[in-house]
Amino acid sequence: MDSTLLEIVACPICHGRLALDQTSQKLVCHFDKVAYDINQGIPVLLAEQAMPLSARQEEP
């Protein structure tokens, strides 16, 4: 994912900063404890498609 895009995207739920999980290739909101898919380089930032993080994924 483009680093410039990563700097401007925000969580659609809390509007907070998202982090890129290099392992799963998902954008993670540690505040809401959810992850968002990245489809062909485009983040899918729909609150209804957010996936809850497992306990292991919650660590920054």
Curated annotation (Swiss-Prot):
List each coiled-coil range: none
Which is one Gene Ontology cellular component term of this protein? cytosol
The organism of origin for this protein: Pasteurella multocida (strain Pm70)
* InterPro entries referenced in this protein's UniProt entry, alphabetically: Trm112-like
Please, which domain of life does this record's source organism belong to? Bacteria
What is this protein identified as?
UPF0434 protein PM0859
Pfam families, per the entry: Trm112p
Q: Which HAMAP family match?
A: UPF0434 (MF_01187)
Q: Which family does it belong to?
A: Belongs to the UPF0434 family.
